[in-house]
């Protein structure tokens, strides 16, 4: 059994969404893509954002970061808005 499960990750990621707002993550595919992108950053030399990861594998670290809230998934719309403010 994989821990945390996709369902658990989706609940954590969508935890701060207000009632009536669009959830950040609608599918398992979104979680997989986010974890893969973060794992690629770690492989390319980015430091883990958690102090003591349970595993040394980049994908496991990325999943743990998502689960603990150390990494946030940003929608394309949010990313564009942040770029305009800068």
Curated annotation (Swiss-Prot):
For this UniProt record, the keywords arranged alphabetically read as follows:
DNA-directed RNA polymerase, Nucleotidyltransferase, Transcription, Transferase
A biological process (GO) of this protein is: DNA-templated transcription
Which GO cellular component term is one of those annotated? DNA-directed RNA polymerase complex
Task: Name one matching Pfam family.
Answer: RNA_pol_Rpb6
Task: Write out the GO MF terms.
Answer: DNA binding; DNA-directed RNA polymerase activity
SUPFAM superfamilies per the record?
Answer: RPB6/omega subunit-like
Reaction(s) catalysed by this chain's protein: RNA(n) + a ribonucleoside 5'-triphosphate = RNA(n+1) + diphosphate
Enumerate the transmembrane spans: none
Origin superkingdom: Bacteria
Q: Is Transcription set as a keyword in this record?
A: yes
Q: Cite the EC number.
A: 2.7.7.6
Describe its function: Promotes RNA polymerase assembly. Latches the N- and C-terminal regions of the beta' subunit thereby facilitating its interaction with the beta and alpha subunits.
Oligomeric form and interacting partners: The RNAP catalytic core consists of 2 alpha, 1 beta, 1 beta' and 1 omega subunit. When a sigma factor is associated with the core the holoenzyme is formed, which can initiate transcription.
Q: Which HAMAP family match?
A: RNApol_bact_RpoZ
- Family according to the record: Belongs to the RNA polymerase subunit omega family.
Quote the protein name from its UniProt record: DNA-directed RNA polymerase subunit omega
